[in-house]
Amino acid sequence: MDDILLEIFHCYRLDIPWGWDHKWWYKLMHTCRRWRYIILESSSSLQLHLYFTHGKPIGEMLEHSPPLPLFIDYGKTEMSTKDEEGVLLALQHHHGRVRLINLREPALQKLVVVMGKPFPMLENLKLISLDPWYCSQLPETFTAQRLRHLALIQVGDVSAPGVPLLASITGLVTLSLRGISSPTDLPVNYLVSRLSLMPLLELLCLEFDSEPFVFRSSSPGNVKNDLAALQTQMAQLSKLDEFIFEGHCRYLEGLVSCIRAPVLTCLTLSFFTRPSIPLPRLSEFLTAAEELRYPACSFTFSGPTEENPGVSIVVAGLEEFSPEDAPFRIRFPCRRIDTQVACAARVSTALAPMLSSVERLHLEYYATRWHKGLPPPIPHEAWFELLRPFSNVQKLQLETAMIRKLSFALCPEDGPPAPEGILPKLSKLIRPHHARFEGMLDPFIAARQAAGQPISKRRCPPTPNSDSEDHDDPWSWLASQLADDDEGSTELDSDSDFDFE
């Protein structure tokens, strides 16, 4: 009978949405003495714990509750004086029971002082400082051998040279270091040496402060020597599933040259400056990450008058998703459209191992405010370099500004036509809805037709409530799915590769 009750308690716990109710077992314990005995005897399997957060009477809970693991969660807002006193009590006298710590400044500066002792049960540690002025740092005597999840946000252990906290932790499953003041505070060689001792790592997040970065003891143009100097140790991250990086592309090049992540399925990259160097190490890294292959890709360029002009590249499956949830994302700032395309081409070359699996490609130019004057011309070779890795693309979708810009390269009035190796498997071209785009790219299509590679044309659905052709919505390609047939450019396209809304 006790086993049946215990199974019911397990089901009751699992039925709680997202596990947000930390006191689900309180009422059950007060039902009767028998239930209380069963629950306390099975506290480990039922994952019982005391949850301390804002307004909780920690002293009373510690005095009158069974010796269960402690969750200390004050990471959302500032703590009151009474909360600080309660947390100090728990950290000083019950550190052997603490399983989760989530603290933030300004109270963090006082609380870390008493953490210079072993925390044998601690599995989850998150320390937050929204202002690096506090510079809180864990004592050197702090240890947590069972730590599985570590997140430090602008905390002194990140900005201190060498990140000493990492020196004693080997069993991490997730590691998030954000607000790192400078790459010199976290040398690639040191980071790789620590990552090599974390075989269970599934998520790695590195976010630097957006400050100018100069590679230590190297000139800006000596990239090969920089990378050669880093080849001292390799970290085999056989379980790494997600990698998030925000910083300088040169640091990323050094890091990915020293790690392997064969089962990586999610990659998010954000560069502080446009990529000014080739990215061969990133290309090698992606070659080894064989799981990072998806059939749809989107390039979004933005106008110079936008708040943060730049390029965004998204790669994902064909199912609906939002850009924030896409398994692969990369973004870098850049103002001029010609430089955007040139840098995107450089990135496209680096991403060739994964872009070769793409079957559907979408090119978009986003601008809410049009700038005066003619945009700078885009070299044809930049377009060819951008498109060359897409050897398997069957469908190309172009938005209003993109079809104009790309047509100059694919259908030049003078000069040689586009090379045969550009989009060799293309069979469907989706153009903007309005009739003025009807004949664009026809010479390119005719050349492919003559070569025995026919390309059918389709139109995007019209934008709802559009009063004129000049109000073409850049997201019109996501309009309702309509029937697709083979009557050329007079029909609307039915395929919807992405849904960003």
Language-model regions, residue ranges each:
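Leucine-rich repeat
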Residues: 1-501
